[in-house]
Amino acid sequence: TGKKNILIDTGTGDKGNDKFKDIYAIEHKPIDKALAIAGISQSEVDIVINTHLHFDHAGGNTIMNKDGGYIPAFPNARYIIQKDEWFDAINTNEKTRASYRKDDFLPLQEAGVVELIEGDREIEKGISVLKTPGHNRNHQCVLIESGDKKAVYLGDLVPTASHIPLPYIMGYDLFPLETLENKKRILNKAADEDWLLI
């Protein structure tokens, strides 16, 4: 925004070993270098919005300190997370356990930088979250408004351009019929109002 630096999702981070990177075909591109291209340092990020806390979207939330513990990667940011997503990430089951790494989010709570929200909400002027369950129970998209222009960051509601057709839903979405309903809702609104899809 004009006054705040807001980052949506932090990627996988650099916690995984070589086997982890091979399994998920991860190409490590340090987020600090990507931010530097935009002229921003990690300490200048004011808000991080996590669409959800799976490791591929929240892995860069934290970094290892010199003592081997984890600290917030964006030390001056508040992290916006759906309250029920936080609960689900802490209370995993056999199906969801592999998607969450507690080192990606528990250190944020210890540092006092987590802001838990419920449902749709304006975060800052022109930046809102829209709860869009389907991929998991508490996924959220981010709506960006500037003047008469709007864009929506879809996260794993529509993870690739190939997933734009309504029936094309990832096989590992926990609630695929909810994904379908939320895709209809968001994509129809985007088409009606000429939103940019991100």
PLM features per residue range, with description:
Residues 58-69:
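Metal-dependent catalytic neighborhoods of phosphoester/phosphodiester hydrolases
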Residues 122-125, 143-145, 150-151, 161, ...:
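Divalent-metal (often Zn2+) His-rich catalytic cores of metallo-beta-lactamase-fold enzymes
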Residues 14, 57, 87, 161:
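Feature marks short, surface-exposed loop/turn motifs that line or immediately flank catalytic pockets
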Residues 10-13, 53, 84-85, 134-136, ...:
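Active-site metal-binding loops of divalent metal-dependent hydrolases
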Residues 1-33, 37, 141-156:
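Conserved beta-strand hairpin/beta-sheet module of binuclear metal-dependent hydrolase folds
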Residues 18-19, 157-173:
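Active-site gating loops and adjacent loop-to-helix segments of metal-dependent hydrolytic enzymes
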Residues 26-40, 44-56, 71-131, 136, ...:
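Metallo-beta-lactamase
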